[in-house]
Amino acid sequence: MITLHILVSILLATPTIVLAENPFDGFLQELRKEAINQGIRPTTLDSVLKGLVVNPKVLALYRRQPEKKQDLSSYLKQRVSTTRITLGQKLLAEHQPLLEQVASEFGVQSRFIVALWGSESSYGRNMGDFSVVRSLATLAHGSKRKDYFRRELLVALHILDQGHIHPSKMLGSWAGAMGQCQFMPWSYDRRAIDFDQDGRRDIWFTQADVFASIANYLAAVGWKNDQTWGREVTLPPNFNSEFTNKKMALQEWQNYGVRRLNGTALPTRKIEAKLIRPTNANGRSFLVYDNYDVLLKWNRSHHFAIAIGTLADRLRPSSVLLLKNQ
């Protein structure tokens, strides 16, 4: 009896314990309030957020991102494969009328549009099958970049509220990149184009919108239609490493002994180029033009930018693979 009395006394003295609400549900409630304050309709939010749960696969992929960077040669072998080149050439010819129209409208060469299309989604064949809203909500709640993913999530909700895509078809990568050009919602909001003028900026299923959105992105951040991206070059023995990342006229690089990869002289065009020797590039060197920096604005990876430029070059007919004036 004494033991029972002591136990009862302890229980009475202990503060009442209330089971905490699911933290993710609380996050969604706060998100809903913020979205309504931004003008998103409650009916849209109810249809998208009701019953939403964390996607554990997204968190696993987020935590499993590789720390070691792939070397350039391996990266190019994967990104600029024979299969990708062959299919890209076929699709470039197949969509030539539309691509020429888009290229003329935005001032971006067709081959670069197709190269980005091929690299981002394998020409629309691999857009990802993750629910963009669920992925972004998971990352906005459980990643180290909560503010970034919350912003992207809110923009995604605006896109749905505007009727550009049905929620069930708003699919993308585990990180929230969407459609055939793999735009994050923020980029979609600013760069996506309704080229066929049907009232929707459809980067998932409308080819005209996909091509125009890619071209518009490049044009908006400074693409120069009269230039290419750059080229791989050879350096003379005992080349001064202090020239790395320097920008000079092509003629000056020629004077310092820099040559095309096949050993021939550089183009005679009056244009400046920067010498880069990226890390993990197996000692390879490149002279790059302003458009290379534009590609870095799409994806801040030297490997990526070089791969896009290389693929764009390979998409040309072999007879004009090497431009003499660029």
Where are these regions (language model features)?
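Cleavable N-terminal signal peptides
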Residues: 6-8, 18
